[in-house]
Amino acid sequence: MQYPEPIAKLIESYMKLPGIGNKTATRLAFYTIDMNEDDVTNFAKNLISARRDLHYCSVCGNITDEDPCEICRDTARSQEMILVVEQPKDVMSMERMNDYHGLYHVLHGVLSPIEGKGPDDINIANLIKRLQKTPAKEVIIATNATPEGEATAMYISRLIKPAGIKVTRLAHGLAVGSDIEYADEMTLLKAVEGRQEI
């Protein structure tokens, strides 16, 4: 038996989200149908609002509803350190530890020849331009501990080092293949404190 078209379309929509397979999408679709109409309307409005009102900061590439973002506008933050991450969610993970007070730069991906992603496909060029205009003395590369993350870190390091800027990499505490997003605050703090020059 096939589901009625509205349910099938809803399931299909949920399956476009990362990590959501057919079973979970079906469960979410039926849960949505059982929600009261006001909650469904608010849910839909919030989805539309997030998509419409959020954009990437013109300075760092983080997701924001203002430009530049709150972090880039914060004059109390150290202008001498820029922590480079893969995705906006990684900024939120780093901010949870409440111990890093520098700036960020979001790449929106990593180098991945298998996926056809080269340097022009991620936010590296803007990082280089930014470093030419800022007093940054250190760039901390916090890409994930994956082969693509490591390759991206080495590539960025080779681009930046000739400018005389110290380039470091998050250290111990992060297992190979792990994502920053899933690390706890203490692990992230130890990784930042133990960063190593590359």
UniProtKB/Swiss-Prot annotation:
Gene3D superfamilies: 3.30.60.80, 3.40.1360.10, 6.10.250.240, RecR Domain 1. GO terms for biological process: DNA recombination; DNA repair. GO terms for molecular function: DNA binding; zinc ion binding. A zinc finger (C4-type) spans 57-72. Keywords: DNA damage, DNA recombination, DNA repair, Metal-binding, Zinc, Zinc-finger. Residues 80-175 form the Toprim domain. PROSITE patterns: RECR, TOPRIM. SMART domains: TOPRIM. HAMAP family: RecR. May play a role in DNA repair. It seems to be involved in an RecBC-independent recombinational process of DNA repair. It may act with RecF and RecO. Belongs to the RecR family. This is Recombination protein RecR. It comes from Latilactobacillus sakei subsp. sakei (strain 23K). The gene is recR.
